[in-house]
Amino acid sequence: MSALSLSITKVSETFSEIYASRAQYLSGFKSVGEFLDVRRISRPRNFSEAQSRISFNFSRFSSNYLAIIAMLVIYALIRNPLLLIVIGIGVGGVYGIRKLQGADLQLSHRVISNQNLYVILACVLIPLGLFASPIETIIWLVGASCVCVFGHAAFFEPPVESAFETVEQQV
């Protein structure tokens, strides 16, 4: 009975940690109105101003930027359905092989070992994966993420209150 109570306690602690981290992550989200305020968009005067804006906006809008990157990942997978199918086959294949729990697969008169199943899965996934062009998708994803995130961070002015915060810290 004590082992059961220990495992329940451990599970509840894990869920509370996940909930706390999720709450902390969600508390970092800024409203859409604040994130997309077009009145605060302007071209930086020089590179150092752009650098300071990027630094400030990364710390302020990090949760929003992660959400944008997640949406771009979802869009990239929807845009490349073959890659999504290859990922599904890979995950399903590994799940099926692990479900055997190390036992060999018995097909009528043929026995296939666990290692051979992984080799067969790799032989199927590598050509399909190359045909699905994952490198192109990754390069597009990196480029689109950089343009969206760095573009917003560089052109979005920090609020006026942030200037007073730095003065207060100096005093």
Swiss-Prot record:
Keywords: Membrane, Transmembrane, Transmembrane helix. Belongs to the PRA1 family. GO terms for cellular component: COPII-coated ER to Golgi transport vesicle; Golgi apparatus; membrane. Its main location: membrane. Pfam families: PRA1. This is PRA1-like protein. The chain crosses the membrane at residues 67-87, 119-139, 140-160. Signal peptide: none annotated. GO terms for biological process: endoplasmic reticulum to Golgi vesicle-mediated transport. It is a multi-pass membrane protein. It is found in: Membrane. One of its GO terms (molecular function) is small GTPase binding. PANTHER family: PRENYLATED RAB ACCEPTOR 1-RELATED (PTHR19317), PRENYLATED RAB ACCEPTOR PROTEIN 1 (PTHR19317:SF0). InterPro entries: Prenylated_rab_accept_PRA1.
